[in-house]
Amino acid sequence: MVIILLVIFTLLTFITWINIDKAALRITTGTISLLLLLATAILMAFNFNNHYGMEKVTKTTTHEIYSAGGSKMPAGMLMAQALGSKSDNYVLVYADKEDGKAKPHFTPDQKHIIEAVKKSATYKVADVDKATVTTKTTRWEWRNDFFKLLFAVGGEGHSLAKQTSVVTVPKDTWVVMTPAQAKQVQKQQAAAATDPAAAQAQQAQMQAGVQAKVQAFMQDNPNASAQEVKDYTAKATATLMADAMKTMLK
């Protein structure tokens, strides 16, 4: 609509100043049409530069994510690759489903670089039970139908203003590492596997540690159900494995 008004007021300005013979009428109508033209141009500029007629609407979503190491590994793993040396912005590797394949998330889209610079992703380690990703998306939306009718020309409505994603992982049962560190851990695990005696001793140590934790839990919680004991056993196993992986990274 604003483009149509701009064309109309431009034509009116031209016609009134050129084709009207009476000076008083020409000046009056010409001035009015010129002012309307300027007002329309200013409104258009305000909308383009300052999103006049629009407001920011924020939507937040949270869902569970799963280990990049697969569901068979007790400890969870998140791979994080920093984008640049100083920015708190990462490409994060994890699985969207429990039995799903791990894949990179939040990789900048080089084909849509303007939108890409408005997006960021980071992670934090917290005292939580499950790993989640929370995405906060802020978009420019029309204040009402009038502004939409007036300015909606190039699909400005629903345009992205900012998007931030935060992956939160449990501090005890998950490990965050870079892709290079993940390869380092894999090499160490492969080297340990070539020594059956060492591998068996490590496994026995792990089992003993889990058993000790479970026994302590049952002593502190004598009325715990079988499911609660099972859940705690899984958590204790994940915690000890995560500790072992963190030790490998030191």
Functional labels for PLM-detected ranges:
Residues 32-53:
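Transmembrane alpha-helices and immediately adjacent membrane-cytoplasm interface residues
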Residues 24-33:
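Membrane-interfacial entry segments at the cytosolic side of transmembrane helices
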Residues 1-24:
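Membrane-embedded alpha-helical segments of integral membrane proteins
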Residues 95-209, 213, 217-250:
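Extracytosolic and intramembrane catalytic regions of membrane-associated proteins
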